[in-house]
């Protein structure tokens, strides 16, 4: 069993919390774009509050532990490991409750290069506990606006975890998929599930648009978020997102394995 102290030490050593790799300038830019209601950073959320830049900086200081000083505009951002641990505990409680009730779940990631293994382990554990891990809209095309213009992607699943790929053959199946912030894939998945007569997920687990897109539609959603992803924390503050865990979402995949073990243990799903 991984102790809280051991996980805290790992979070700091791996750069998952403490001083993280996200530049302060990038976080502040995201807050500025969110305040302007730029859909690229809303991630499918339709916030009800005003949420100006100063409001967002205060919120992110409270939720993540970043500096609340608006004059601090350069360097690397900081995540308080205690907030990460509290978030993981709340995240694990939701996963455990879903497993206990054996509800249908949907898992999806916009960070397949880094986080796919984390979600695959959760999908395996939830399936073993009797949850139906949904895979709707597999093979469906979704047009997503990127910085390069509108690109067509395909919804795909790897061991129960949704992601998007560029069209074409996926080779031997080891291709990790594309990075995406868009809520369109989760909307496509939910629409496909509804068209097929259900069931719909009672819990969505993921990041980026998978969480905010589902939460905005009234489905319980939990996920991981970096300091430049204010939408998940706004969603948590407003009630559309159940749990947003502050953590660097861009470190090596192996560094998330202790988080997986911790969550599964706390959720009573360790095998």
Regions found by a protein language model. Name each.
Residues 91-95, 186-193, 259:
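Generic hydrophobic alpha-helical segments
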Residues 108-120, 207-212, 228-229:
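Gly/Ser/Thr-rich loops at beta-strand to alpha-helix junctions
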């Amino acid at each position: 069993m991984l102790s809280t102290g051991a996980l805290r030490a790992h979070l700091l050593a791996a750069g998952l919390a403490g001083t993280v790799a996200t530049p302060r300038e990038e976080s502040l830019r995201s807050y500025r774009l969110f305040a302007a209601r730029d859909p690229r950073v809303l991630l499918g959320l339709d916030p009800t509050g005003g949420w100006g830049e100063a409001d967002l900086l205060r919120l992110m200081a409270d939720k993540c532990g970043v500096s609340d000083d608006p004059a601090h505009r350069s360097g690397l951002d900081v995540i308080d490991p205690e907030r990460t641990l509290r978030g993981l505990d709340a995240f694990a409680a939701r996963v455990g409750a879903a497993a206990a009730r054996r509800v249908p779940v949907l898992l999806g990631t916009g960070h397949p290069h880094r986080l796919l293994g984390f979600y695959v382990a959760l999908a395996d554990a939830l399936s073993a506990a009797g949850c139906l891990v949904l895979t709707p809209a597999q093979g469906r095309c979704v047009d997503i606006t990127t910085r390069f213009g509108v690109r067509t992607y395909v919804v795909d699943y790897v061991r129960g975890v949704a992601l998007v790929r560029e069209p074409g053959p996926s080779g031997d199946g080891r291709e990790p998929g594309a990075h995406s912030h868009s809520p369109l894939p989760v909307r496509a998945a939910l629409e496909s599930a509804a068209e097929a007569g259900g069931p719909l997920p009672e819990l969505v687990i993921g990041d980026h648009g998978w969480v905010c897109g589902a939460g905005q539609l009234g489905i319980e959603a939990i996920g991981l978020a970096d300091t430049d992803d204010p939408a998940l924390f706004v969603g948590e503050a407003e009630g559309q997102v159940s749990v947003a865990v502050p953590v660097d979402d861009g470190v090596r995949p192996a560094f998330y394995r202790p988080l997986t073990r911790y969550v599964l243990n706390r959720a009573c799903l360790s095998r």
